[in-house]
Amino acid sequence: MSIIETINGLMINNDYIDIVSNNIANASTIGFKSSTPSFFDIVSHSFYSNQIIKSGVGISNLVQNFSDGVLVQTNRDLDLGIVQDGFFRVLDSKGYVYYTRNGHFLLDKNKNIVNGQGMYLTGQNQFDLKNNLNSISNLEPINLRKSDLLSAKATSQIKLKADLINDFSSTNSITGKNDDISNSEIHDITIYDKNENPHKLNISFNQIDDHQWKLNIQLNDEKIPDNEIINDNFILKFDSEGNLISNSSLQIKSKNSKNIILDPITLNLECFLEKSETNMPSIELSQNGYTKGFLKHFEILNNGEIIGQYTNEEEQKIGQIFLAKFINPEKLKPESGSIWSATHESGQEKIGAAGDQGFGSLYTKFLESSNVDLNKELINMIIAQRNYQSSAQAFKTEDRIINTLVNLK
């Protein structure tokens, strides 16, 4: 062994110790991925002959281990963990894009979602979602301030689900054909006009013939006298199997006066089936209007959707976090703070929602711990130290041989 080989051995094993030490030091770092050196032997050829000369060892590259770390529950809304493929995409103040598995995020003073280094978590905000701007080029820092206020919305749609009881045969003998022979109980629902004023609608049914019903809608509002009739001419017809065969989408309009200030409302009849069994009628009502509300809380779903909960008891999707992945993540360039930057060898980023095909799963209120195996790294440290000591001992031996040769007389 030559002095050059021993020096080479000292340098390489010193680098090996540094790599293992870095792994051990980051055993508790959130989202940290361990690295392993890839060694290769150095071979040279003699200038004067074809003799092959072994010249030591080198490190060709660091192999990054992107296996999953263990998820640790924190019960904190802005702690996120990824299982399998995917990175959080973050943006620094200069607009450079980085990638991380550290899902510990915060809200800054401007209500941006940021990591511990102040980098902005990217995704889509409420405006992009409402306008169906789902292109990757529209990813931007997620900002919740834009969703602080949920503007009032006038009712434009009412959904009505009902199962009615066909009892015409039992009453037909004592009533005229065109008389109302069966009345349902009155059901009410609160709707909203464009000025955020609530109004109560009463809805009831009258059976007027076999497989025919009349739908009655009235306003039960103190501000509008005489229980204003909105419509009284909705006739619902069913076939012999109890399926609705008349129009299932109706327009609610005022019939009597101009007191009403509601926007046009569409009444949708969903799954409206008539049953002849002796069951109780079942009616469900819902509508899409509400008064204004302020954001009081939000939660992040497993697909990255951010759901805002407002003081008016409404819930709205106000943003979405998207993940990035790479064909060759081992070639990402490590940066300070458990982040990586893309390289030519890593390939271009591919963006998608958590849980989509090829993308990992997102777990809220969890953090991914370091994937460092301490037992393995401590063994590697012992091996690296032994190798270093062996190279140092070889260096001493070479040094003594050289001194002996120099001192020969």
Swiss-Prot record:
UniProt organism field: Buchnera aphidicola subsp. Schizaphis graminum (strain Sg)
Pfam families linked: Flg_bbr_C, FlgE_D2, LlgE_F_G_D1
Gene: flgE
Location of this chain's protein in the cell: Bacterial flagellum basal body
Single GO cellular component term: bacterial-type flagellum basal body
Identification of the protein by name: Flagellar hook protein FlgE
Family, per entry: Belongs to the flagella basal body rod proteins family.
NCBIfam families, sorted: FlgEFG_subfam
Alphabetical keyword list: Bacterial flagellum
A biological process term (GO) from this entry: bacterial-type flagellum-dependent swarming motility
Residue ranges of coiled coil: none
Domain of life of the organism encoding this protein: Bacteria
